[in-house]
């Protein structure tokens, strides 16, 4: 299947190695210096572009966390719309370090992933210059992204905005009782700069 230019651009913009060095130096109280890897993987390739993502504190690059899969797809009810479906590895520890060592991803199969039904983002595209775009991903209305991790139920709010060189992430953990953010982009997005294209 051939992919739309919008889907190809979104995949290219999201694929790469990123960090938020400038933000962490400018606002060290609020933002840890992180490295984020988003590697293309050969899954669901008949209708999607799929990425493996994980991140690490810059001082602990050997201890990455938040392993996840982003499946970028055309929206079923739209000729131009896109959306992102999140998955979680059933055994995240088997993929620790795959951002830096992509050979670990070669044997990954769909059967090793858990679909996260409420963890879906709708993507809109805005032209910012000729052949240059910004994609903004927001949760679908009336959805709640929850999943089990280490025998706990976790709720997160997801979202991002990406251009060819920058990625802003709005992911944050939510306390299910109070509805308040407990970790992540509490005072604003993490502002990453792409350092390497994958």
From Swiss-Prot:
The UniProt record lists the keyword Transport: no
Keywords of the record: Lyase
KW Hydrolase (keyword) present: no
Listed Gene3D superfamilies: CpcT/CpeT domain (2.40.128.590)
One Pfam family, short name: CpeT
Induction: Induced by nitrogen starvation.
GO molecular function list: lyase activity
PANTHER family: CHROMOPHORE LYASE CRL, CHLOROPLASTIC
General function of this protein: Covalently attaches a chromophore to Cys residue(s) of phycobiliproteins. In vitro is not seen to act as a chromophore lyase for ApcA1, ApcA2, ApcB, ApcD, ApcF, CpcB or PecB, the lyase activity is therefore unsure.
Family membership: Belongs to the CpcT/CpeT biliprotein lyase family.
Protein name, as recorded: Phycocyanobilin lyase CpcT homolog
Organism (species): Nostoc sp. (strain PCC 7120 / SAG 25.82 / UTEX 2576)
């Amino acid at each position: 299947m051939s992919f739309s230019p919008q889907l190809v651009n979104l995949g290219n913009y999201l694929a790469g190695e990123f960090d938020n060095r400038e933000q962490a130096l400018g606002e060290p109280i609020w933002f840890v210096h992180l490295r984020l890897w988003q590697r293309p993987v050969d899954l669901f390739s008949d209708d999607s572009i799929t990425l493996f993502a994980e991140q690490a504190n810059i001082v602990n690059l050997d201890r990455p966390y938040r392993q996840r899969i982003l499946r970028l797809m055309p929206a079923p009810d739209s000729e131009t719309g896109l959306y992102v479906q999140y998955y979680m590895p059933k055994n995240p520890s088997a993929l620790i370090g795959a951002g830096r060592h992509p050979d670990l991803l070669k044997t990954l199969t769909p059967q090793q992933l858990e679909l996260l039904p409420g963890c879906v983002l709708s993507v809109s595209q805005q032209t910012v210059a000729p052949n240059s775009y910004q994609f903004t991903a927001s949760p679908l209305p009336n959805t709640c992204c929850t999943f089990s991790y280490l025998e706990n139920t976790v709720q997160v709010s997801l979202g991002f905005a990406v251009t060819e060189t920058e990625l802003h992430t709005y992911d944050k953990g939510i306390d299910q009782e109070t509805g308040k953010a407990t970790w992540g982009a509490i005072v604003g997005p993490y502002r990453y700069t792409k350092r390497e294209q994958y």
